[in-house]
């Protein structure tokens, strides 16, 4: 008989997001990790992998540095999750830049430009 998972992937993703956000604020001391916000977490059905989407304020260089810092802290953050969440297995973490906020800002700029051009004609 197969044991049912304790958490659904969506609930587990929310718990991981909350716990990692706490770890970034209180535990992670890497100077490369600047203004990082966890925007989303998705977990595979078997909970073996979690993709963590992050938004980083700053230049492309600062974003790359922050992502590098997060990737080097993956083991520490995974251990932190294991200590704070009662899971059978702790998912492998994969950090990705979330550029949706940048895209939304660019769309807003383009819409504002179109509006200015239409009102100016």
Regions found by a protein language model. Give the residues of each.
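Charge-rich, low-complexity N-terminal segments
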Residues: 1-49, 55-121
